[in-house]
């Protein structure tokens, strides 16, 4: 199934959480927090102003991003867990 977000929405794949701490302690699944870093998979066409002009999004597919802990809606597309969020939920682009 192909999916393209609408307007100012962004489809994001979370990066995997670290399995170990820097000191070598293995973190059990129950203690892991959801990662707040991801990769943009697809973007919508942009937000529409009152005058009808469309403003393109600042992020593009392939960008590594940081987002808020509670940002986005979890969805499953082609068996993969992804997030759909507004561009305003994105804190910044990494790198």
Curated annotation (Swiss-Prot):
Classification via PROSITE patterns: CHAPERONINS_CPN10
InterPro entries xrefs: Chaperonin_GroES (IPR020818), Chaperonin_GroES_sf (IPR037124), Chaprnonin_Cpn10_CS (IPR018369), GroES-like_sf (IPR011032)
Annotated GO biological process: chaperone cofactor-dependent protein refolding
Keyword Chaperone: yes
One Pfam family from the record: Cpn10
GO MF annotation terms: ATP binding; metal ion binding; protein folding chaperone; protein-folding chaperone binding; unfolded protein binding
Key word Ribonucleoprotein present: no
Cellular component per GO, a single term: cytoplasm
Disulfide bonds listed in the record: none
Protein name: Co-chaperonin GroES
Function, in words: Together with the chaperonin GroEL, plays an essential role in assisting protein folding. The GroEL-GroES system forms a nano-cage that allows encapsulation of the non-native substrate proteins and provides a physical environment optimized to promote and accelerate protein folding. GroES binds to the apical surface of the GroEL ring, thereby capping the opening of the GroEL channel.
Subcellular location: Cytoplasm
Recorded family membership: Belongs to the GroES chaperonin family.
PANTHER family found in the cross-reference section: 10 KDA HEAT SHOCK PROTEIN, CO-CHAPERONIN GROES
Keywords, alphabetical: Chaperone, Cytoplasm
Subunit structure: Heptamer of 7 subunits arranged in a ring. Interacts with the chaperonin GroEL.
């Amino acid at each position: 199934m192909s999916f393209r977000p609408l307007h100012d929405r962004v489809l994001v794949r979370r990066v995997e959480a670290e399995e170990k701490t820097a000191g070598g302690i293995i973190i059990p699944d129950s203690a892991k927090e959801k990662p707040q870093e991801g990769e943009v998979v697809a973007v919508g066409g942009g937000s529409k102003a009152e005058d009808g002009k469309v403003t393109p999004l600042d992020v593009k597919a392939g960008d590594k991003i940081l987002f808020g802990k509670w940002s986005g809606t979890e969805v499953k597309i082609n068996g993969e867990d992804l997030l759909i969020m507004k561009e305003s939920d994105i804190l910044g682009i990494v790198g």
